[in-house]
Design a protein with these regions (language model features):
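Flexible, small-/acidic-enriched active-site or ligand-binding loops
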Residues: 150, 203-234
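Long, acidic (Asp/Glu-rich), low-complexity accessory segments flanking structured domains
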Residues: 226, 230-248
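Short glycine/proline-enriched turns and hinge-like loops at secondary-structure junctions
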Residues: 78-79, 147-149, 173-177, 191-194, ...
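A short, Trp-centered hydrophobic/proline-enriched beta-strand micro-motif
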Residues: 131-139, 183
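Helix-loop "lid/cap" segments that line or gate small-molecule binding pockets
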Residues: 106-115
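A short core secondary-structure module
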Residues: 160-161, 165-209
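Glycine-rich phosphate/pyrophosphate-binding beta-alpha loops
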Residues: 169-174, 218, 255-259
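Alpha-helical interface subdomain recognition
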Residues: 1-94, 98, 115-120, 127-131, ...
Length: 364
């Protein structure tokens, strides 16, 4: 019986079928960018609680931001979401999940692509593609959580401005963000039909950022409380139509869920690979841990479950590229992938013993 375990998650990539040569070339380029520019400074940013802003402009200069933004605005000009998925995979695989490019690319940019006027596109898309503008979206409130229809932040029309009042919390990219898409209530007679999306820009009077929230993980992902006190937001900063914000928010959910699923599979695969390397080297009771039957069963089960989950998520990715991914199927992918990640990482951590609890070991 062999005393080593092959835990390579990379070895299955050629068999997946969802990516082509152009995608893999893009993957290699982005992987090099992470290894040379992001990973070396990541521990510092984790301690400081925020990613250095120049990482966004560097990502933009290499073509890793706004891949779906038209070329005339400095973007990649491709609506192929597989490029976005590669970024989500590689960020997660490299263990730099706090690098907020997925939020910028997959969650924020689509609102500008789908609902911005021509004037707004000229005003904001070039900066979003270059990284000069970092985006965030503010939905969650202290008293509403994920109940979007219960949003209490208000925006009252006053001439050619909306007067915005309210507060948001748990806003990712909240410290770095230059522009924030704020979900606010412009009509009070309908829970679902009275929301609108306003773009609040850095420096607007009455727009304040609270503390950078101290979390148990993803420390470099700046997460802030935001407050709005009589902020005068120009009508020209309304995204889409007034009162249709809830519909806009819900329409992007499948893609947001898919991004999380893709990242979760990559994180689980990386945990399996790291753990396989560890048990091959670590000796206990006179032989490598990899020679213990329980270890082999545990690694094999984690690897199989991750690859099965990956197959389902890849299917969802292909459906999304074809415009056929439903909200419920995307929710299934998110649920399956995150629960698998939880099980796999826990099993891997147990095999590392006390070292699994040490921050210097990536599995932790």
């Amino acid at each position: 019986m062999a005393s080593t375990i092959n835990g390579s998650a990379r070895s299955v990539a050629p068999e997946r079928g969802v990516y082509g040569p152009d995608h893999e070339a893009f993957r290699d380029s982005f992987r090099r960018f992470l290894a040379t520019r992001v990973v070396p400074g990541y521990e510092t940013w984790e301690r400081e609680g925020v990613i250095a802003r120049e990482m966004f402009t560097e990502a933009g200069s290499h073509g890793f931001l706004g891949m779906a933004i038209p070329e005339e605005f400095g973007g990649g000009g491709s609506d192929d979401f597989r490029f976005n998925a590669i970024i989500a995979e590689e960020v997660s695989y490299a263990g730099v999940m706090s690098f907020g490019v997925n939020l910028h690319n997959d969650i924020c940019v689509p609102y500008f692509l789908h609902y911005a006027t021509d004037e707004q596109r000229h005003r904001w898309l070039p900066g979003l593609a270059s990284g000069e503008l970092i985006a965030a979206i503010a939905m969650t409130e202290p008293g509403t959580g994920s109940d979007l229809a219960g949003i209490a932040t208000t925006a009252v029309l006053d001439g050619d401005h909306y007067v915005l009042n309210g507060s948001k919390t748990f806003i990712s990219n909240g410290i770095n963000a230059d522009i924030v898409i704020v979900a606010a209530r412009t009509e009070s007679d309908s829970r679902h039909g009275g929301l609108s999306l306003l773009v609040v820009e850095r420096g607007m009077e009455g727009f304040e950022r609270g503390r950078n929230l101290d979390k148990i993980g993803m420390h470099a992902q700046d997460t802030a409380e935001l407050s709005f006190t009589d902020v005068r937001v120009p009508v020209a900063n309304l995204l889409g139509e007034s009162g249709r914000g809830f519909r806009y928010l819900v329409s992007n959910l499948p893609q947001e869920r898919l991004t999380i699923a893709v990242a979760s599979v990559a994180a689980a695969a990386r945990a399996v690979e790291l753990t396989a390397d560890y048990v091959n080297e670590r000796k206990a009771f006179g032989k490598p841990l990899a020679a213990q039957q329980n270890t082999r069963f545990t690694i094999a089960d984690a690897h199989v479950q991750t690859e099965v989950t990956r197959a389902f998520v890849d299917n969802c990715l292909a459906l999304h590229v074809d415009g056929a991914l439903s909200a419920d199927r995307a929710a299934m992918a998110k649920l399956a992938a995150t629960e698998n990640q939880d099980r796999v990482v826990d099993a891997c951590l147990q095999l590392l013993g006390g070292y699994g609890y040490m921050a210097e070991y990536p599995v932790s």
